[in-house]
Each structure stands twice: as structure tokens, then as C-alpha cells.
């Protein structure tokens, strides 16, 4: 059975639209909540869309930068961005109103390989943009921010990055799609963040040597105006074309209770990071 059939054809998917009104830490808590729901057969698969105001989501490795305080001051004081540490992935990414995040959450244990889970997202994104005269590649764009094996690029310019997190039998595959504005300007900001946070110091972990020119938005790559809202419609059309059965079942009382626990963990993680910073 091919992956498109396995994950989408006549498969129930619950659509959760969180494109406004949430803080980033709430988003990561919701994905953990839904992962547990799916893993315990309390929910069908979940597809969630989320958009946030100017925030840099730092990874676990970023929290160990030698001059992290200086890097965060640059983001907050000079660029007007908030900064938080997430619970998945190793390095920082940029979120703002021109970036759409999509989470695909489905059941899976060790039998579902990391590559298979990533490929499910790639299949969906490819379906969304199948009418465009472009080729979307999956390969690491080494000089991007948060580089990874499943970076999505067009003509070697990265416009999306994918991460995944596994919680209690559920797998959350998360993608950010840089749609509006300038991808290279966002990359320039991250380049300057690492310069401030490293100050040339040698570290055991190799942080990305960012070249802003290797990142771009879909607006730039497709050479036409395209809005986040347009891509949200493309997502729903693609799911239907792949044969998915969509519903919008509300969040249950049990999920709200579990969400509060996961949100508290996110708050605790970030409070510990803030304690270490000399603000």
C-alpha cells in the first residue's frame, strides 16, 4: 500500500484551525495533547493549522548557546520578536503572520519510521502545489536556519522545514511554510542572532552558518502574490483530493485537562531557561 492511500484515502482527519488567538507555547501543548488523543484512540488523525505573531522558536541546542542572552536581546530589542524554547527539534525557526504552520498528527510507534512520517507531510505539500510549474525537492539546505534532511526547497532555495515529535503513541509532524514576505530577510535575522549568541566561540555542537540567499518565500519562488489564507484552502482541497474524510470535532473536556498539563510543562521549561539568562 502506498503512503497516500495508507494515510489519507478514506481515513478520518479532524481539522483544527488555530490560525489566530494562540500563543506559540499553547500550540506546542496542543500538539502534544492531540498526539496523546490519537495514540490512545480517543481521536482520529488531526490536521492543525497555526499562525503566530513575531516569535523565534528556539530549539534545545539553542538553549545552550554561550551568549544566548545577547542573542535574545537582539531579537526582542532590535527586531521586535519574542523568543521561546520549544519541545521538538534542535534549532531555531521564525514565526510571523506570513508563515503557515501545519501539524499532521497520527498514530504510530516504532513501526513507523522517522522517514515515513516525514514523507507523509511531503506527499501532502506536493499535492497542495501540484498545479504549480515547479519541482519541490527534499534535501538538507545546509546554510539555512534549522537545516534538516527533509527541508523543502525550489531551485535550492528553502521555503519550509519539517520536524516531528512522538508522544504517547502519537506522532506529530510539524511544518512551517514561508509564504509571504522575504525568506532571506528572516534568514538574515537568524544569522545575526547566532552571531550575537556565539561571538565566534567554538562549541561542541555545530550551529548553522547561515547564508540568507539560500532561503526564500513561496511568494518569491512562485513569482506571484500568494497569501497564507490561500495555502490554507489548498491544504483542505488537497486532503479531499487524497480521499480524506474531514470533520471539525470540538476539543473534549479530557483534552482540555491534558492540554493544561502540557502547557504547564512548556511554561516550566521556558521559566528554567529564563532563570539562566542574565536579564
Curated annotation (Swiss-Prot):
Quote the catalytic residue positions.
Answer: 146
An example molecular function term from Gene Ontology annotations: lipoyl(octanoyl) transferase activity
**Site feature: Lowers pKa of active site Cys:** 158
Please state the pathway this protein functions in, per its UniProt record: Protein modification; protein lipoylation via endogenous pathway; protein N(6)-(lipoyl)lysine from octanoyl-[acyl-carrier-protein]
Q: Which is a GO BP term held by this UniProt record?
A: protein modification process
**Which keywords does UniProt give here?**
Acyltransferase, Transferase
- State the reactions this protein catalyses: N(6)-octanoyl-L-lysyl-[glycine-cleavage complex H protein] + L-lysyl-[lipoyl-carrier protein] = N(6)-octanoyl-L-lysyl-[lipoyl-carrier protein] + L-lysyl-[glycine-cleavage complex H protein]
Q: Which residues form the BPL/LPL catalytic domain?
A: 41-247
Please indicate if the UniProt record lists Nucleotide-binding as a keyword.
no
| Annotated EC | 2.3.1.204
Q: Does the keyword Transferase apply?
A: yes
Q: One of this protein's Pfam families, by short name?
A: LplA-B_cat
The EC class name is transferase
Cited function: Catalyzes the amidotransfer (transamidation) of the octanoyl moiety from octanoyl-GcvH to the lipoyl domain of the E2 subunit of lipoate-dependent enzymes.
Q: Which PANTHER family would you find in this protein's record?
A: OCTANOYL-[GCVH]:PROTEIN N-OCTANOYLTRANSFERASE, OCTANOYLTRANSFERASE LIPM-RELATED
Q: What else is known?
A: The reaction proceeds via a thioester-linked acyl-enzyme intermediate.
The UniProt similarity line reads: Belongs to the octanoyltransferase LipL family.
Protein name from the UniProt record: Octanoyl-[GcvH]:protein N-octanoyltransferase
Source species: Staphylococcus epidermidis (strain ATCC 35984 / DSM 28319 / BCRC 17069 / CCUG 31568 / BM 3577 / RP62A)
Q: Which gene encodes it?
A: lipL
